[in-house]
Amino acid sequence: MKYAFFFFYATGISIIFGSCRIRDKQLPDVSISNPAQVLFDNEIQEAQQLLKEGDLVLRNGNEFSSQLIKNFSKTDKTYSHGGLVFFENGYPLVYHILQGDQNPDEKLRRDSLKRFCNPRKNFGFAVYRYDLDSIQLARLKKTIHDWYIKGVRFDPLFSLETDDKMYCSEMIRKSLQIATDGSLVLKTTRPTKKEADYYTYYLKLPASYIVNMNFVAVDNLFLNPKCRMVKRYEFDPQQALTGGQKK
C-alpha cells in the first residue's frame, strides 16, 4: 500500500512539473464524429453570424497549462486565452499570441473560429464586444494587422514595457489603448507573494520578479463597463475529447 501511494504521488508530481513547460501535445484541428460534430459545427456557425469586427473571443482551455493561466485572474477564472476578431474577405479570423507546440514560432497568428475553439482542447468559449465606434475599430484593426505583419512574438518575461514581444492579453490591452487614444485602458493584476512562489515554476521566472509584475489577467479583458457579453458556449465535459455540445 505504501509503495503504491508513493508511485502515484511521484507520478502526479512528474505530470504537474512536466506540464509547466507548456508543451501540451498537439491534437488535430477538429476531427470529431457525429452527432458531436454537428452540434459543434452548429455552434460555430451561429457564433460566426454573431461576430463583428473587433470582437473579443475567449476560450476555456482544458489542458493543465490553461488551468494555471486561469488562476492569474482574481475575480472570474473561467477563461484561459483570448483573441480579437477581424474579417478577411468576409471571413472572421481570431488574432492571438501564444507559445508551445500549437505555435512553434511564437508569433502573432490568426485562426478560424473553429480552430481557435477546438472542443478537443477547450471546455467552451464566449464572444464579448467592446464599446467602440467605427474610427476606433479601424484603428484597432490597423494596429493588430501592423503587429501581425511585423511578426510580434510571445513575451516569456510577461513585461508591459516591451512592444516587440507581448502575451495575448497584453496585446489586446495595448491595442485597445492605442485605438481609443487612451480612453479605454484595461486594468492589470499584481500577484501576491504566495501566488508568485507558485507561478515561478510555470513562468520559469524568479518569484521576486513575478511579485512585482503588473499582469494583464484574462478577466481584466472583459470585466469592464465598456465590454459586454454577446454569447457564451459551453461544451459537455464528458465529450471534451470527442466533440462539442452546448449545455
Predicted regions and their residues:
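Cysteine-nucleophile amide-bond enzymes
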Residues: 18-247
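Bacterial Sec-dependent N-terminal signal peptides
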Residues: 1-27
